[in-house]
Amino acid sequence: MKSRKFFSKLKEESYDVSIFDLMNAKVYLEKDMTYLPQDYKKGYIEDFFTFFPEVLKEIKNKTEEEIEDFEIEDEEIKRVELRLCSMGSKQTGRESYEKLVKTVINYLIFINERPLHALTTRFPGGKQIIEKNGNYYCPIKNAQSNELSICEFCICKDLNEL
């Protein structure tokens, strides 16, 4: 699929994410992160719900003409979709969360080529993504190599490569 066509689809989807979806997604994520340390959970949720709405707004404000037109492998799009559908628990708010995440993550991976987390996100141990000379380095890139992680699709390199 051509990137402009895929972007057009994502832009359409971005208008389907309502304020109620954002609220439901937040409740969902808070429940899904129940057993994480409170300070980590609080910071993660704050970063997530600052970053993802900003990216949604970016998608809505961007035109198709601003997107470089290149081929995206349909199989890669399907792989990301399947991975996103397998993440998290199946509780109330899941649909709203998926709607938000699918739109934003696909944009970040295939169109904008930016990290999947905000640069302000603090990971366990207090580390965060570092940007240096146009490259991004993540402290958990290689630590999250399980079949439920989406790290393999992220543009970030491992922090140890810095």
UniProtKB/Swiss-Prot annotation:
The lineage of its organism: Archaea, Methanobacteriati, Methanobacteriota, Methanomada group, Methanococci. Pfam families: DUF2115 (PF09888). InterPro entries: DUF2115. It comes from Methanococcus maripaludis (strain DSM 14266 / JCM 13030 / NBRC 101832 / S2 / LL). Belongs to the UPF0305 family. This is UPF0305 protein MMP0665.
